């Protein structure tokens, strides 16, 4: 059976504590807790739906490190993090009822292209 979104979904306290700790820890990216933003990220290119507790949009690798360090703390062991690029997965890979770590909003630059050696260096959010 395919899970359907509930019209309302309460946010769980340990997620609020985690998101507040992100801000206190120097996270410079955006944090989306509102229902509208969460609903947009509840789907991808699949038929599945999962409403996340929140979404974070890291500005850079420093922000990603802050997220990872906080998630490793014992008081945040219940927090589920799921990375997301363009949401183009066809099997619901980027969907979660935890926190979406959306890397496509700010970390989407092509840093270097080496045509002769046929390689590129990109940030994690590059999807096209």
What positions do the PLM features span?
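Extended, alpha-helix-rich binding/interface surfaces that flank or overlap catalytic cores
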Residues: 125
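N-terminal flexible segment immediately upstream of the FAD-binding catalytic core
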Residues: 1-72, 76, 86-118
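Beta-sheet entry/capping signal
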Residues: 78-80
């Amino acid at each position: 059976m395919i899970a359907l979104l509930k019209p309302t979904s309460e946010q769980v306290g340990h997620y609020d504590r985690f998101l507040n700790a992100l801000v206190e820890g120097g996270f410079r990216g955006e944090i989306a807790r509102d229902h509208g933003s969460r609903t947009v990220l509840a789907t991808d290119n699949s038929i599945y739906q999962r409403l996340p507790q929140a979404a974070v949009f890291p500005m850079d690798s420093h922000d990603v490190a802050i997220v990872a360090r906080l998630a490793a703390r014992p008081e945040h062991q219940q927090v589920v993090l799921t990375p997301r690029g363009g949401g183009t997965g066809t099997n619901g890979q980027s969907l979660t009822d935890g926190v979406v770590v959306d890397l496509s909003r700010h970390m989407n630059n092509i840093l270097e292209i080496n045509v002769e050696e046929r390689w590129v260096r990109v940030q994690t959010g590059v999807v096209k």
